[in-house]
Amino acid sequence: GGFDHTPLFTANVGRFHQGMIVEVPLQLWSLPGTPGIEAIRDTLSARYEGCRFVSVATAEETSDHAAMLDPEDLNDTNNLRLYVFGNAETGQAVLAAQLDNLGKGASGAAVQNMNLMLGLDEAAGLV
């Protein structure tokens, strides 16, 4: 909620059977309070702090991957890694999520949710 404009989701395709990058391009002016790139990264980091399967890349890690994110980096895991790329001068940012669509995808989510509903360890049966 709170968006005046509908976000645009994009996916990357390539010659790999497993792994995925999903992107959400943002016009910073369209967000409440017109946050900067670091503010978005800080908000995501605070939200996912302590989450076992979700991590947010630091500015340095994001810079190291600016040329290319490998969709297969998280294969065979239940992990999801978030990156915030952006250009403060143009007021644009891209949120990128890196995941194994076969692990963190629907089957992994089903196991994780079942564990939570049954009061089991969230990671039971997951890689």
Where are these regions (language model features)?
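NAD(P)-dependent Rossmann-like dehydrogenase/reductase catalytic/cofactor-binding core
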Residues: N79-V127
